[in-house]
Amino acid sequence: RPAVIFGHTDLVDADEKYIGPRRLSPPEHLSWKSFKHGMLVCHQAFFAHKDLFRTTAYDMKYRFSADFDWCIRILKKGDAKKMGTHHAQCIISDYLNEGMTTQNHKKSLLERFRIMWRHYGGFSTIGHHLWFFVRKP
């Protein structure tokens, strides 16, 4: 029984017209450590096992990146229970290209930095953010 079933996400515009696949793709094997590399799986394409879902609420102190923190915490709990993950190998969701996080990009990045610091520590977080800066198109 997997802790999480996850898949791919396509981007759409406000009229629900297809734009293309998301720039970040989910890895074949997803773990809480995978999120060091960014939000690799949209929460819309991330289905937590019901036992984990029921006991893991969004942390509402995060206005724009609560999903990022939630996914990491779900995966950590699944890891502690020796539950794996399952890549569905298909497109599970469409995602609005200009959503709330995009409209509040700087605030979202600051929240995400704080979340990563909490879960991965300072050295790793700073190193990965330097990589995010380099990889950005």
Regions found by a protein language model. Give the residues of each.
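Conserved nucleotide-sugar donor-binding catalytic segment
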Residues: 7, 20-111, 115
